[in-house]
């Protein structure tokens, strides 16, 4: 320990302890607000100890998530916290305008990736890398993120689409319990440890709705089926079928209660993962029907009985090993469940078939006891590995969407954490190698690449040292010689190789490598690799055999003869297919080893991650006993050192995680130019964020495009608008830096720009809507005016047409009236003045001869409608008294072609007056007698309303007189 404080050496250990206690009390006095620090970049000073204190203070307050710049630190609570993952909380983070301002949570990372896919300048797929030691909570974190995306990425409009989306989401969520049941197991460090790696692609369409998913798995630990370490368990599914099967199923699968199985250690322990009904229901939702499920569980029960088969050496070495008497029942039961011939099953494990020579002559050799056990284990591992791969393919076919229906994806990487056990073999070597590659991806993407980019873009940056694991990767996978290459070479040499020989070769060939060590106290052959998370000792015993992963052809041929429908599907009998050994024997091509295949799949995964925008979640395990409310500083400190969290905090506190090219920045945020005036001079008082250069915001403003300058000039107005009294920092600093080709900014600045852009888009949309409404109203007004004009013109035309018709009718009536008046006047004067003692019909006859029948009928119809006063007014002026009435009567009885309109002649009316003469001037003496005329005795009534007298005579005059 360095005994120096403020430049003064401490005189004694007592003074040092006193000073340390004083500093500790001072630190503890300020520990109260530590749990309120949501971001470790705000810790001052940023050291490993202060970060550790802050995490411990938050863990004590049941705050399990803390930001560390671009990384989220997640502490495993080792207890259920239902309110921390409630659906209401998911909706709260999804609906928040700025989720970064809420409490740190995995939902913040999930929402950030979802919004990046939704509104990213350059549409790039997103990925979330969940890393940490075994038991740190990676699987739980991935499961909660999948539930979060299932909630927020489902917003279809129609009811039918909503049902389809719900079905897809349910299938995606149901894939978790199935894969955990068949791929997870209880280990020394974790009760639900993932024994395989998986990368889940959540597929989104253009509307950011989840349309499907795809699962890719890596390196299933199939050796766990036949070999479990002390105090560990087999895969969960074996315990589920033994504990959850019904009585009928137990009889069908030959699993009586209390039966002990060699491959089922620690069956008395009860875990939450041993829920058989959840697994069966999830399989049913994924399209695996009940008969197929029963077939799967029957095969698994056959594997358990196969594990109870044990061999003993034969007395005669020329004879194969014999099965123990107490395990013969297990052979029979296993053959029955797998639907294999019992004899062939035993022979495939007891006898080895060898093909030699050019003619491929077949020889049979009895196997030793160890070889029989190895072939038995190989048969079980082969069946379980094929079954697991088939389940993954069924899950993908059930949840994967068509490639044309999705445009982007969010990847969730959940791999096994760093492992170090008392006995580490090839599985732990591959697992830790994968963690080294992921650590290098984080270092290369964030720690190294970000700082190098700052320097290239012209930012005045103080380089932060970090722990690089490239030397360890060179030891593991370097070219031309590395640990993996040496192990693969031992497999290709096809010679007996002992564990000590492999150890000697590794130590001698790779001597001098800084990350290679040796435990001199160990009696077993082994070598030590110093990983980024700590040194791990690997035993070389069985390392080469596991890397070869040989499958005897007899076992494959045996399984192809099974009558079980599932095994027939997993091992199709294809005569054209040749085994790996046959192909390698004929072509002499090197066989693919476990390390080679795993390395290839890992490179493919890293290439996918390289093409996405990564987000990191560091899961920390507070204690190795998985106890709640227990924070062991030493264990947490080792994990913080291993993952380089302090370096991450340093770079995040002073850096700009968001980088956008000038062109993309202009294309997306050119709307913000309207917020501020356009200027051609400097940017005034704008300064970069803390930790960057002291120069103005844009050091090379002359080379920038005018649009970019206008946008940068508008930023102060945008920040001033968003500033609040409680957040005065926004009034003084702009967390944005303009590099040579890119714009660098913080997450808060990006959120601010997006809010300003959304407001401008809203204003533009409002202007467009107003203009459209104005145009639509103006168009409607023009249409209304045109319609009114057309209606007025049409009504005017109709009116003129009607008036024209009335005018024509009036003209006709007027002409007819004038003709009638003239003729009546002429007729009356002739009758009165020049036609003495002439019969009255002459006038009608003359009129009839001068008028056409049509005019006569027309005038008759009109005259019959005339009132009597009009007739009398148009009669001769010299006629008075009774003669005037007779003239009127004669006028009304016009000539007509109808018989009823004929005027009686004087000969027909001899009893009345026979002529009308001009009265002589002077006194006249009338000699009266009783008149023979009809109605002569009726006196006209002067009342106009009474139809009596002469009016009655006139009305009835058209009727013929009955003689």
From Swiss-Prot:
Biological process terms in GO annotation: mitochondrion migration along actin filament; mitocytosis; regulation of cytokinesis; regulation of mitochondrial fission
Pfam family membership, one: Myosin_head
Domain notes: The MyMOMA (MYO19-specific mitochondrial outer membrane-association) region mediates association with the mitochondrion outer membrane via electrostatic interaction.
UniProt protein name: Unconventional myosin-XIX
Record keywords, A-Z: Actin-binding, ATP-binding, Cytoplasm, Cytoskeleton, Membrane, Mitochondrion, Mitochondrion outer membrane, Motor protein, Myosin, Nucleotide-binding, Repeat
Membrane topology listed for this record: Peripheral membrane protein
Segments of this protein annotated with the region MyMOMA region: 829-963
């Amino acid at each position: 320990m360095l005994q120096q404080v403020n430049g003064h050496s401490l005189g004694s250990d007592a003074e040092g302890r006193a000073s340390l206690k004083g500093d500790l009390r001072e630190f503890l006095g300020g520990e109260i607000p530590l749990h309120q620090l949501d971001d470790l970049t705000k810790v001052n000073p940023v050291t490993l100890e202060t970060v550790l204190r802050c995490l411990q203070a938050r863990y004590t307050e049941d705050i399990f998530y803390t930001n560390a710049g671009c990384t989220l630190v997640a502490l495993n609570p080792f207890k259920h916290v239902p309110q921390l993952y409630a659906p209401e909380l998911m909706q709260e983070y999804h609906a928040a305008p700025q989720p970064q301002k809420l409490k740190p949570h995995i939902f913040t990372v999930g929402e950030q990736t979802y919004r990046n896919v939704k509104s990213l300048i350059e549409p790039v797929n997103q990925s979330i890398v969940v890393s940490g030691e075994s038991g740190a909570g990676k699987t739980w974190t991935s499961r909660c993120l999948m539930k979060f995306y299932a909630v927020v990425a489902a917003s279809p409009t129609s009811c039918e689409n909503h049902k389809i989306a719900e079905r897809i989401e349910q299938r995606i969520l149901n894939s978790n319990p199935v894969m955990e049941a068949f791929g997870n197991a209880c280990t020394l460090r974790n009760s639900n440890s993932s024994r395989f790696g998986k990368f889940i692609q959540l597929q989104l369409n253009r509307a950011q709705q989840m349309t499907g998913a795809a699962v890719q798995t890596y390196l299933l630990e199939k050796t766990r089926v036949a070999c479990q370490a002390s105090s560990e368990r087999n895969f969960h599914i074996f315990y589920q079928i033994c504990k959850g099967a019904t009585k009928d199923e137990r009889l069908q699968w030959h699993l009586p209660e209390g039966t002990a199985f060699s491959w089922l250690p620690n069956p008395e322990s009860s875990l939450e993962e041993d829920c058989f009904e959840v697994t069966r229901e999830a399989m049913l939702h994924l399209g695996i029907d009940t008969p197929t499920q029963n077939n799967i569980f029957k095969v698994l029960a056959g594997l358990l009985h196969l594990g109870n088969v044990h061999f003993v050496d034969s007395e005669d070495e020329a004879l194969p090993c014999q099965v123990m008497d107490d395990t013969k029942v297990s052979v029979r039961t296993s053959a029955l469940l797998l639907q294999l011939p019992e004899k062939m099953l035993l022979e495939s494990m007891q006898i080895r078939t060898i093909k030699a020579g050019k003619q491929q002559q077949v020889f049979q050799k009895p196997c030793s006891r160890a070889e029989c056990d190895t072939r038995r284990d190989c048969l079980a591992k082969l069946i379980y590995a094929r079954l697991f791969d088939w389940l993954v393919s069924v899950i993908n076919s059930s949840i994967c969407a068509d490639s044309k229906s999705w445009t982007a994806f969010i990847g969730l990487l959940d791999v096994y954490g760093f492992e170090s056990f008392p006995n580490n073999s090839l599985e732990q070597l591959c697992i830790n190698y994968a963690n080294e590659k992921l650590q290098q991806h984080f270092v290369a993407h964030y720690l190294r690449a970000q700082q190098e980019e700052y320097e290239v873009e012209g930012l005045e940056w103080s380089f932060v040292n970090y722990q690089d694991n490239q030397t360890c990767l060179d030891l593991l996978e370097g070219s031309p010689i590395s640990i993996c290459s040496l192990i693969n070479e031992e497999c290709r040499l096809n010679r007996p190789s002992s564990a000590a020989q492999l150890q000697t070769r590794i130590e001698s060939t790779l001597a001098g490598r800084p990350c290679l060590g040796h435990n001199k106290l160990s009696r077993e052959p082994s070598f030590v690799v110093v990983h980024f998370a700590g040194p791990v000792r690997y035993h070389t015993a069985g390392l080469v055999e596991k890397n070869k992963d040989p499958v005897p052809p007899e076992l494959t041929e045996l399984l192809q003869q099974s009558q079980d429908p599932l095994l027939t599907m997993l091992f199709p009998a294809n005569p054209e297919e040749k085994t790996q050994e046959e192909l390698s024997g004929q072509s002499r091509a090197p066989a693919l080893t476990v390390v080679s295949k795993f390395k290839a799949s890992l490179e493919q995964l890293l290439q996918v991650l390289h093409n996405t925008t990564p987000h990191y979640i560091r899961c920390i395990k507070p204690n190795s006993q998985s106890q709640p409310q227990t924070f062991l500083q030493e264990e947490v400190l080792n994990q913080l050192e291993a993952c380089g969290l302090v370096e991450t905090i340093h770079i995040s506190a002073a850096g700009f995680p968001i980088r956008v090219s000038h062109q993309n920045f202009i294309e997306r945020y050119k709307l913000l130019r309207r917020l501020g005036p356009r200027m051609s001079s400097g940017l005034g008082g704008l300064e970069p964020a803390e930790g960057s250069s002291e120069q103005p915001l844009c050091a090379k403003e002359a080379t920038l495009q005018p649009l970019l300058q206008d946008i940068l000039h508008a930023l102060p107005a945008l920040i001033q608008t968003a500033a609040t009294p409680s957040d005065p920092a926004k009034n003084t600093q702009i967390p944005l830096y303009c590099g040579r080709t890119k714009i660098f900014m913080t997450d808060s600045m990006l959120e601010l720009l997006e809010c300003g852009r959304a407001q401008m888009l809203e204003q533009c949309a409002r202007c467009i809507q107003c203009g459209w409404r104005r145009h639509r109203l103006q168009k409607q007004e023009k249409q209304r005016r045109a319609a009114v004009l057309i209606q007025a013109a049409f009504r005017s035309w109709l009116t003129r047409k009607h008036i024209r018709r009335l005018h024509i009718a009036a003209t006709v009536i007027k002409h007819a009236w004038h003709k009638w008046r003239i003729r009546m006047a002429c007729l009356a004067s002739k009758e009165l003045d020049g036609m003495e003692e002439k019969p009255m019909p002459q006038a009608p006859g003359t009129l009839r001869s001068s008028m056409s029948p049509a005019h006569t009928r027309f005038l008759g119809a009109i005259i019959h409608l005339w009132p009597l006063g009009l007739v009398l007014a148009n009669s001769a002026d010299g006629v008075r008294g009774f003669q005037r009435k007779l003239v009127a009567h004669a006028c009304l009885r016009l000539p007509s072609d109808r018989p009823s309109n004929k005027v009686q002649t004087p000969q027909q009316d001899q009893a009345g007056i026979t002529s009308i003469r001009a009265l002589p001037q002077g006194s006249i003496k009338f000699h009266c007698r009783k008149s023979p005329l009809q109605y002569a005795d009726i006196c006209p009534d002067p009342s106009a309303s009474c139809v009596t007298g002469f009016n009655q005579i006139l009305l009835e005059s058209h009727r013929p007189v009955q003689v």
